[in-house]
UniProtKB/Swiss-Prot annotation:
UniProt-listed PANTHER family: PHOTOSYSTEM I REACTION CENTER SUBUNIT VIII (PTHR35775:SF2), PTHR35775
Annotated SUPFAM superfamilies: Subunit VIII of photosystem I reaction centre, PsaI
Protein name as annotated: Photosystem I reaction center subunit VIII
Taxonomy of the source species: Eukaryota, Viridiplantae, Streptophyta, Embryophyta, Tracheophyta
Protein's cellular compartments: Plastid, Chloroplast thylakoid membrane
GN (gene name): psaI
UniProt keyword annotations, A-Z: Chloroplast, Membrane, Photosynthesis, Photosystem I, Plastid, Thylakoid, Transmembrane, Transmembrane helix
InterPro entries associated with the record: PSI_PsaI, PSI_PsaI_sf
NCBIfam families assigned: PS_I_psaI
Pfam families reported in the protein's UniProt record: PSI_8 (PF00796)
GO biological process: photosynthesis
Main localization (coarse): plastid
Keyword Cell inner membrane listed: no
Membrane topology: Single-pass membrane protein
Amino acid sequence: MTTFDFPSVLVPLVGLVFPAMAMASLSLHVQKNKTV
């Protein structure tokens, strides 16, 4: 567990998870608008 290795793992994780969550919530919002 090195201090330099932690950000290098965290950055791609956040860079992938955050957009994925954003797109998922966006698609859910679009689906809700289409059904109503």
